Amino acid sequence: MPENECNLAKERVVRSETPETTCHACGHDAHMAMCLTAGRILNSHKDELEGIIYLCFEEGEENNTGWPAMLKELEKYAIDAVWGIHVWSAMDSGTLCVQPGPRMAGMSWVQPHFHGRGGHGSRPDLSINPTICAANYLVNAATAMTQKITAGETVTCGFTSLKGGVVGNVIPDDCKVLGTFRFFNMEEGKKAVRLVSDIAEHTAAMYGCTVDELPDLDEIIPPTVNDPYIAGILEDAGSSLTFLTRSLRSKAGSCTSAGMTMTP
C-alpha cells in the first residue's frame, strides 16, 4: 500500500529502497516474531515433547499468497493438525481468542476483463464500449448477490476498481473490474464464483463484448474454521488464564485455512 507507518513505538532500523510503497499494515512482522519465539520456546522443551513441529512462514497473504508452494512441500509429511494465529486490532492488546467454528472468511478475487472495440467518443455507435459493459456488470453482479445467495447466509462482495480509458474523448478497447468477495460457507462461496462468472459472460454478450480472467473454483481460499476438538484442548489448557477472550469472526481472509485442508 502507498503509505508509511505513523505509529512506530521505536525508531525504524530496517528501511526499504521504496518505503512509500511497502506498507501492508496487517502486522506480519508481529506474526514472524511470534512464530520464531514460539519455536524457540518449544525447542527449549524438546526433550519433554513427542512428535515433530514444523514452523511455517508464509511469504504473502490474500494476494501473492505463498500457501500453494508451502502445501506442496508439506505433502511429504504426515500433518496431524495445523495451528495458525493472526493479530487483530479489534481485540484488546494482550488477549487471545481460540473459539471453535468459523473465525476468518473464505475469499476469491473478482477481476473480469472486458474486451470491446475502441473509438472516438463522438461516435460511440461505431465502437463496442467495454466501459458501459463493465459498469452494467457491476450493477448486475451486486444485485445478484442479494437475490441468489441462500437466505441466512452471507457473501460480502466488494468491488474496488473499474479501469478503462485514460482520456475523456476516446472509448477504450478494454475495461477491467477488480474486487473480492468473502464468505463463511464454502458452498455459498462456490455459488458466488459461478454466479459472477455467468453474469460476466452474459453481460459481455449483451453488449457485444468478450470477457476473460474469470474467477476459478480451484483458486478459492476456504474459510478458516477452527476444529471444535482442537479448539477445546486450547480453551481447556488456558481456562485459568485471564487473557483468554471471545471475539467476533472476521471477514478478512487467512490462508491458514488452506493448510487445514491437508489435516484429518
Predicted regions and their residues:
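Metal-dependent amide/peptide-bond hydrolase catalytic core
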Residues: 132-264
